[in-house]
Amino acid sequence: MSDVENQPFFNIQRVYLKDMSLEQPNSPAIFLEQDMPSVEVEVDVKADRLAESVFEVVVSGTVTAKVKDKVAFLIEAKQAGIFDIRNIPDEQLDPLVGIACPTILFPYLRSNIADAITRAGFPPIHLAEINFQALYEQRLAQLQQQAGAAAGAPNGAPNGTTLN
């Protein structure tokens, strides 16, 4: 093999909106409410190995806005990417998939969610930046804690999945 073939390689093959749903269970009455909505945001990351060097990474986001006890809207979206990653040492592969890939995908997710909320007739909600490294490290610590509590249990990747 030549040196070029052994060089670390990272390529974004595709970025795509995998899934999105929007519910407005209390429309149109909710538009008459004067109170400011409370907003809850949840974000998750999953990864699957599709081939030897090809990974699908999915960043999921759920935004729920409520006025008093009534749901104004609920939006769920999954932004995905297919990444070709080769010649990366195993100890660097999981952080690359769990930190770098979600960092690339999140701006697309944030934009799609803001656009859908606006098109639904609500003021835009701009999701704050996420420190995926801190999220990754937090999950890694949780996995290590669980592994210590249940010695001998198989470990998954900190991004919530086991890479096969």
UniProtKB/Swiss-Prot annotation:
Keyword vocabulary terms for this entry: Chaperone, Cytoplasm, Protein transport, Translocation, Transport
Any GO CC annotation of this UniProt entry: cytoplasm
Molecular-function GO terms, alphabetical: unfolded protein binding
Nucleotide-binding listed as a keyword: no
Pfam families: SecB
Compartments where located: Cytoplasm
GO biological process: protein folding; protein tetramerization; protein transport
Quaternary structure annotation from Swiss-Prot or TrEMBL: Homotetramer, a dimer of dimers. One homotetramer interacts with 1 SecA dimer.
Function of the protein: One of the proteins required for the normal export of preproteins out of the cell cytoplasm. It is a molecular chaperone that binds to a subset of precursor proteins, maintaining them in a translocation-competent state. It also specifically binds to its receptor SecA.
Stated family: Belongs to the SecB family.
Protein's name according to its UniProt entry: Protein-export protein SecB
